[in-house]
Amino acid sequence: RDGYPLASNGCKFGCSGLGENNPTCNHVCEKKAGSDYGYCYAWTCYCEHVAEGTVLWGDSGTGPCRS
């Protein structure tokens, strides 16, 4: 499954430099979602093939962003 991983405050991880092979998103996706690939889409990191059990934005039980 694919999606937006969440920071500890319930917010998506921001990024700049839209597109593929974004170093920030690759790092976030590896560390927070167990994914080997991520990119910057709509100024937030999006991860593909996330690890099972990873909580993603929009999952049941996730609350609003507490920025």
From Swiss-Prot:
Keyword annotations for this protein, in alphabetical order, are: Disulfide bond, Ion channel impairing toxin, Neurotoxin, Secreted, Toxin, Voltage-gated sodium channel impairing toxin
Decide whether keyword Oxidoreductase is in the record: no
Under PROSITE patterns, the record lists: LCN_CSAB
What does UniProt give as GO cellular component?
Answer: extracellular region
The lineage's top-level taxon is Eukaryota
Coiled-coil-forming residues are none
Give the SUPFAM superfamilies listed for this entry: Scorpion toxin-like
Q: List the disulfide bonds.
A: 11-65, 15-40, 25-45, 29-47
The protein's GO terms of the molecular function aspect are: sodium channel inhibitor activity; toxin activity
Q: Where in the cell is it found?
A: Secreted
InterPro entries from the xrefs?
LCN-type_CS_alpha_beta_dom, Scorpion_toxin-like_sf, Scorpion_toxinL/defensin
> Which parts of the sequence belong to the LCN-type CS-alpha/beta domain?
1-66
**Tissue-by-tissue expression:** Expressed by the venom gland.
Family, according to the entry, reads as follows: Belongs to the long (4 C-C) scorpion toxin superfamily. Sodium channel inhibitor family. Beta subfamily.
Q: What is known of its domains?
A: Has the structural arrangement of an alpha-helix connected to antiparallel beta-sheets by disulfide bonds (CS-alpha/beta).
- Biological function: Alpha toxins bind voltage-independently at site-3 of sodium channels (Nav) and inhibit the inactivation of the activated channels, thereby blocking neuronal transmission. This toxin binds, in vitro, to sodium channels and inhibits the inactivation of the activated channels. Seems not toxic to mice, crickets and sweet-water shrimps.
- Listed name of the protein: Alpha-toxin Cn12
Q: Give the originating organism.
A: Centruroides noxius (Mexican scorpion)
